[in-house]
């Protein structure tokens, strides 16, 4: 009986400490998180395009190749592929997928014990969007919590379709191509549709 009481006392202390720690972390990080409403009308950076008299592209200047598109212009199979590879439960969570997060934490503990390195990131589409819009890409512990807080704010203020549209237009695909349309033109020389 004493062992059980001791276990319950330790568990209550641990849970209270965790709650106080998370509350303190929230109070510290929340003022650093931008307001999610600023992303409703985000301006997508497009390069300067020089066209010839015949209308063909001669040159492109700028750090990013971006061609903004609407969600209606994106083929459904591409949307399905993004959701299935990046965030299977995209329509079921509110910015943070706690199932994937807990699985990733267990995987991380296992990887640290066996010294295999770090596991996957457990980032949802909304968290990836938050990272690509607001935070630098350095791997820091606090950045992940900032992503989570901003993802929660984004999910409160934007619809899932608005989030997907921003993600499909802003995610880097390599070779300076930002967004799915720019990636299709960069890698395949044609439009998404």
Model-derived regions: residue spans:
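Juxtamembrane regions of bacterial inner-membrane/periplasmic proteins
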Residues: 1-193
